[in-house]
Amino acid sequence: MRLVFFYSTIMKRKLDHGTEVRSFPSGKKPCPSPTGLPFPATPTTFRDFRVNGQRRRITSIQPPTGLQEWLHTFQSWSGPEKLLALDELIDRCEPTQVKHMMQVIEPQFQRDFISLLPRELALHVLSFLEPKDLLQAAQTCRYWRILAEDNLLWREKCKEEGIDEPLYIRRKKVIKPGFTHSPWKSAYIRQHRIDTNWRRGDLKSPKVLKGHDDHVITCLQFCGNRIVSGSDDNTLKVWSAVTGKCLRTLVGHTGGVWSSQMRDNIIISGSTDRTLKVWNAETGECIHTLYGHTSTVRCMHLHEKRVVSGSRDATLRVWDIETGQCLHVLMGHVAAVRCVQYDGRRVVSGAYDFMVKVWDPETETCLHTLQGHTNRVYSLQFDGIHVVSGSLDTSIRVWDVETGNCIHTLTGHQSLTSGMELKDNILVSGNADSTVKIWDIKTGQCLQTLQGPHKHQSAVTCLQFNKNFVITSSDDGTVKLWDLRTGEFIRNLVTLESGGSGGVVWRIRASNTKLVCAVGSRNGTEETKLLVLDFDVDMK
């Protein structure tokens, strides 16, 4: 029965897509068809399925008169006419005659056609199966299990899911002769289990990282197993995401830290003391202090060896983090610069003068001033093609970076859009109106609004998303998990006891397996700390 099920599954997908598969839902594609191995021609009659030695002959009687003429007439009919004739014929058969037909037909559909194909072609056929069906197919028979462990087959499945690293496991059990372990299959299974943990795994007690006393954590970075928190207490702290220990405290700023970036062993911070500092994360040493701004450094964006900083002095500066040299100064805004994006080629800035500007940093030229917002610009996203800006005027605007034209104005939020994230034309925006929206920036359509009975009860403070989930935090003291595709609420990941009475989740950062939350309060009801939740699985 398993063989019948999987053949029907494969054939259905084959029929759905046609002989040449031109498009796949969710961007999925099968393994490339092996060169020079076309699919065998579809049998024209049931006789083509049967080996002569397997045919059941009734030799006890002579063929009735007119049988050949009747068969010739049957062959001349169309497909629908043949089906009608068979229906009428079955209605006139006795049970023993129907049983005879079943004994002839059923064995032919229980044959393992996959085992008759060349290995390359069999793998191509199996590539049409979803991973869950492929795992079930491995239980069908020994040969199918060998095929279903093929590493290249699972590599393609991993690519479809955005998994780019195989997983090598030291197994205690000896694998049976003839079977090989697929690292790509292990990687796929691990990711599936991690996703399940996020959705419904037991929420273990988080690691609690206490620091910064009762001050506000203003910025948060998370890379590898290292967490960096910046605070208005003038310091940054470097933490181990594994042990929860504070590895070092970065002391040197004489004002609150309001922005930071991190890459590898380099940390960059911006402060109300009007400077940026470049730190060695391993040693805690301050490598450079970058002087030039005349007011608070409010935002920054790091790309390779350069960082662009935006300040309340209305300027932006481009710095070389290796030498500490200021390479360029971008002047043109007439109010504080609140947000900046930099892709190595273009700088995009948003400011309290209601403007968004696109710059060529090498020539210090403003290429476009994007006008349209009627209040302060607080958030930006830039993918090299589109600029997306969020404003206190409640709107979000999508711009063409080359022409400066406004492509779409996204309306629906009721207050300040404080945070956004953009990936592959999907934008997720968080707003002070307590809602989160998912947009398609190509069409300007709002795909989902994350609301309902489980929605946030106060302003959304931070968000992050991947191909499956949206994670949001709020002034209401909760961190929520949502389904990206459906917009459905999944569950609360964090709920502060002081939520609703002052407890706040200021910032969140997530990796594939961990969630870091910066929490505290403005009225002393919640101690300032970091919470680290782990969703990893043990594949030993």
At which residue positions do the language-model features occur?
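Intrinsically disordered, low-complexity acidic/Ser/Thr/Pro-rich linker and tail segments
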Residues: 21, 28, 35, 47-50, ...
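Structured C-terminal portions of repeat-based eukaryotic scaffold domains
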Residues: 368, 394-396, 400-540
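WD40/WD-repeat beta-propeller blade N-cap
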Residues: 210-217, 251-257, 291-297, 331-337, ...
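Extended intrinsically disordered, low-complexity segments enriched in serine/proline/acidic residues
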Residues: 1-107, 153, 159-161
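WD40-repeat beta-propellers
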Residues: 220, 236-240, 260, 270, ...
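A structural motif specific to WD40 beta-propellers
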Residues: 204-207, 245-248, 285-288, 325-328, ...
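Conserved strand-to-loop turn within each blade of WD40 beta-propeller repeats
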Residues: 230-233, 270-273, 310-313, 350-353, ...
